[in-house]
C-alpha cells in the first residue's frame, strides 16, 4: 500500500510539473506605446517593424521602424532575414495586423516578440515623439 501511495504521488507530481508553463518558450507580449517609446529611446538598433502597407508607412511611422507589410506575399521571406534571437517589436494602425504578424513570428521561431497595444493610433493619442 505504501508503494502504491508513493507511485501515485509521483505520478501526480509529474503531471503538475508537466503542466507548468514553459518560461523559455516563445511568447508574445502586448506592451504599451510608452514601453515601445522607452525601448526605442534606449536602443536605436532594435528590431522595430511596422506591418502596415507601404502607403500607410509613407504617411507616417515610428522613426527607426522598417516596413514589412504583413499582408504581402513575401512577409515571411522578409522577416526571416531578421534575428530570431533578438527582441522584435511590431505595430500596425490599431493592433489587429500586428497581432497576426506576432503569431506568424512566433510560428517562425522568434524568441521575444512585443506587440504594441492599440497600434500607431494609440501611439499618436499618447502624444509620443520618435515619429518620422
Language-model segment annotations:
Residues 2-9, 16-39, 45-46, 55-87, ...:
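Rhodanese-like catalytic fold shared by cysteine-dependent sulfurtransferases
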Residues 48-50:
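Structural scaffold elements adjacent to functional motifs in cytosolic proteins
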